[in-house]
């Protein structure tokens, strides 16, 4: 992947969801349950391998199995597996913009770029889980969420 500049989009949260549900008796048929238990650890292992190999990593949001609106858990999973908090944030911003070929308009806070901003109380570099508790959301310069106080 590194040799070809290919991005890895792990979506660890999908594996976590499937592996966790595999522990709920009856959630999956027995034939599937055994295989489902292994998904989370396999994704984590491949993530660590990509991280250690300096493969470009972008943020996955389309797990299809976990609850919608819980995408920020992915930051926690990435950091738990050894990624630096700033690199986890970059995976969701500039790295994803580069993967999609839209980095001239998105992915970083710069004059002339589209204003997509979230804010949290505290420093996510100290506690990445803060990104699960946004109090301010701006997309394309329009405020969608602004909880003050």
Residue ranges and their predicted role:
Residues 130-132:
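Short, small/polar residue-rich loop motifs at catalytic or cofactor-binding pockets
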Residues 137:
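Short aromatic-centered micro-motifs
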Residues 4-40:
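Active-site gating loops and adjacent loop-to-helix segments of metal-dependent hydrolytic enzymes
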Residues 126:
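Small/polar (Gly/Ser/Thr/Ala-rich) solvent-exposed segments
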Residues 28-31, 38-123:
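His/Asp/Glu-enriched, well-ordered alpha-helical/loop segment
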């Amino acid at each position: 992947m590194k040799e070809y500049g290919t991005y890895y989009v792990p979506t660890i949260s999908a594996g976590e969801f499937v592996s966790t549900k595999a522990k709920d008796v009856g959630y999956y048929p027995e034939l599937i349950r055994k295989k489902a238990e292994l998904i989370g650890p396999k994704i984590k292992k491949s993530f660590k391998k990509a991280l250690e190999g300096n493969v470009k990593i972008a943020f996955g949001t389309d797990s299809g199995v976990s609850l919608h609106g819980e995408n920020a858990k992915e930051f926690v999973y990435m950091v738990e597996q050894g990624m630096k908090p700033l690199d986890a944030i970059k995976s969701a911003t500039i790295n994803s913009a580069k993967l999609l070929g839209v980095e001239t308009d998105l992915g970083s806070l710069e004059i002339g770029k589209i204003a997509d901003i979230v804010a949290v109380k505290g420093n996510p570099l100290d506690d990445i889980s803060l990104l699960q508790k946004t109090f301010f959301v701006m997309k394309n310069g329009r405020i969608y969420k602004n909880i003050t106080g």
